[in-house]
Amino acid sequence: MSQIAFDPPYVPRSQCDQALAVHGYAVLHADDVMGWVPASREELAQLHRAWDDLPADAYLKDGGRYRRRRHSCFVIEGAQVTQVPHRPHWQPLAYNALHGGMQRWFEPMAADMLALPVWTRLLQRLGATATALHGERPWFVEAHPFRIDTTDGIGRPTPEGAHRDGVDLVAVFMLDRHAIKGGESRVFAADGPAGQRFTLWQPWSLLLLDDARVIHETTPIQPLVPGELGWRDTLVLTCRRDGFQSA
């Protein structure tokens, strides 16, 4: 159970590409995500099991212990999905003032999870959405399974603050909220005052972002009951043209 302040501005699956093109973001209800991938609830639940085995993030510069994660990279060309040799996650300081400018080597995602057919379908759909938005080309995808918890009392999903990622498309899948309050998503136009705030709460609901046009952040989480551990599980996928970001 968790506290919800503002419901997401869901759009029908049939209007997803149009909403992305017009507004720079789109939010899909979990039922629409199942049709979008396509996938059953059981298949998506199989993917989520891997979140119970995420190592701690050793790179947090604020000294926190609240983030657990893995990281793997892929190339999508049409329907072809290829995992690339394990590589570090790197962002320039211009996009991540807190953790940019350094190579961060996270443990790779579990092989048994990546072998699930639903994982390939999910990446294929992501590539098709990026192509609808930006045109056909190879897409360089970084996958980040995250668990933010309340070990330190407060967990910060985006310790770097409101930001862009330096990619073409960002997908944030909400997998689970357990015994927390906070974790509000905020999306702002990169070139103006327009913005939205809402709380992703439904397992496997989805926020899609045209990274060039919007800035995003998620507010900190706190436990609903003091002393009781809470957490927020997400899967973040980024698509970038012309290669992975590198030093």
Q: Predicted segment positions?
A:
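Structured loops at beta-to-helix junctions and adjacent beta-edge loops in soluble globular domains
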Residues: 31, 76-79, 144-146, 174, ...
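Conserved hydrophobic/aromatic beta-strand scaffold that supports enzyme active sites
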Residues: 27, 73, 145, 161, ...
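N-terminal auxiliary "cap/dimerization" subdomain that precedes the catalytic jelly-roll/cupin core
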Residues: 1-93
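Conserved aromatic-histidine-acidic binding/catalytic patches
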Residues: 35, 39, 111, 159
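Catalytic core of non-heme Fe(II) oxygenases with the double-stranded beta-helix
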Residues: 133-202
